[in-house]
Amino acid sequence: MDLAVRKMTLEGLGVSQLGAVHENLPPARLVEASVRRREGMLAENGALVCLTGKRTGRSPKDRFIVENGLTRGPVDWGPVNKPFPGERFERLLAKASAYLENLEEVYVVDAYAGADPRYRLNVQVVCEYAWQALFTRQLFRRPSREELDAFEPDWTVISVPGLLTDPEEDGTESETFVGIDFGRRVVLICGTRYAGEIKKSIFSVLNFVLPTEHGVFPMHCSANVGPGGDVALFFGLSGTGKTTLSSDPERYLIGDDEHGWSDEGIFNFEGGCYAKCIDLSREKEPQIYDAIRFGAVLENVVVDRITRRVDYSDASLTENTRAAYPLEYIEGAVDSGRAGHPAAVLFLTADAFGVLPPISVLSPEQAAYYFLSGYTAKLAGTEADMEADVEATFSACFGAPFLPLPATTYAAMLSEKLREHGSRCYLINTGWSGGPYGVGERVDIAATRQMVRAVIAGNIDESKTYTDPFFGLQVPLEVPGVPSGILNPRETWADRAAYDDQAAKLADLFRENFKKFEDGVPEGVRKAGPNV
């Protein structure tokens, strides 16, 4: 970016008189700076290991959207999208500016959010920490040198983990603050080193801008494409297997977390992956394992300080250990980040109750119902301040924490896309079988991969099915390469009466949760849920 443009954009946010500003450094120099500044250390595999302190996940209670004329009407205000007064945000921004001006060094990354030039955002990220600049460089899409010369930011993200907010003085919930101002086009992140806040804040921005300004459907999903051009989408919350299942050596990865679906096809918002790596092994997830090398960031992963060997099984810091790396580290990843319309759409859920079938075929109405329901399990450590190890939860559209607009807006966009392009839809349970969490076992990843391959190949559509008596789902009687005994969840429980009781309880939870959507959906969708 031209220095005059940089100066003008930052001064427009009240930021001036900075110390040394390091712009768009390559990974090696950012790693070097991180080690020099003692922000992290190198592991034996070459990755940079950084710790985030007590905030080892997102801080949803501390996320706000500035209420103004642009957001007052369309935003779905509530516990997820909490309003924040513009004048208070101005004061916090001034605090952040003063804080930045007192730092000896600041790291700035210019990047794209969105692989399709028609819809992408130019994002300028200003970081207190060099390792967060490395994270940003590897996770966002990287402009060429020529593009950087002409780069002008649409949005600015300011990440100052060392600035702790004061609830009494600043009107925040805690010392942490994540605020989005759609008027000034700025994101302010204070009091947390968890780097996922940077990427998810811009995801929230895209989830507002793309539907309202471009008619593009934003999705919390991973995506891959086969040699024949057949595209598959994988929806699901953190820990349900989006990254794992879309990283298939027989297919080409488009992206692991955030995509848009336009009239021309799908496109990745990002240029990298942010994979959970608790219990990671080369045997189970070879692509992810091999992508963790020099230039990658390991977040809250335990490392032996003497040997520098990584222990992916150690959850003493958090279950939410993460690896951030660029897509180019995945062999066969789609460089363009773009592909055609999806043939198969998969909803992933980690069912903590252990009662949902491992695979179900969804009608268009059921697709809308289960998309709006967004049922999964909130696994330990994917958010800060969690009280239970596992908590069953409903997160609309498999991404409620990141959706500024009403959930029914996104569901209507999905239904329209499925109708227009004839995409098939499935529900995949990557959670528990044979009992609830703590009693049953997690569905084997190898079996889940076989189910996914059968779905993509179209083999499921030719299989005979039975109707699940509790949820009305069509469940295949057989799937190639998968033991038929696990396809009927009731048969995997030693105590069938206990299964019936647990299934009825979950069905009740679905019905209770869906009441808030009933007035905003067609009758067919209202009737597509559990039938007991």
From Swiss-Prot:
Classification via PANTHER family: PHOSPHOENOLPYRUVATE CARBOXYKINASE (ATP) (PTHR30031:SF0), PHOSPHOENOLPYRUVATE CARBOXYKINASE ATP (PTHR30031)
Similarity section: Belongs to the phosphoenolpyruvate carboxykinase (ATP) family.
SUPFAM superfamilies recorded: PEP carboxykinase N-terminal domain, PEP carboxykinase-like
Cofactor: how and how many bound: Binds 1 Mn(2+) ion per subunit.
Primary site of residence: cytoplasm
Protein name listed in UniProt: Phosphoenolpyruvate carboxykinase (ATP)
Subcellular location: Cytoplasm
Keywords: ATP-binding, Cytoplasm, Decarboxylase, Gluconeogenesis, Lyase, Manganese, Metal-binding, Nucleotide-binding
Record's signal peptide: none
Top EC class, one word: lyase
Role noted for this protein: Involved in the gluconeogenesis. Catalyzes the conversion of oxaloacetate (OAA) to phosphoenolpyruvate (PEP) through direct phosphoryl transfer between the nucleoside triphosphate and OAA.
Any one cellular-component term (Gene Ontology): cytosol
Record-linked InterPro entries: PEP_carboxykinase_ATP (IPR001272), PEP_carboxykinase_C (IPR013035), PEP_carboxykinase_N (IPR008210), PEPCK_ATP_CS (IPR015994)
Gene that this polypeptide is encoded by: pckA
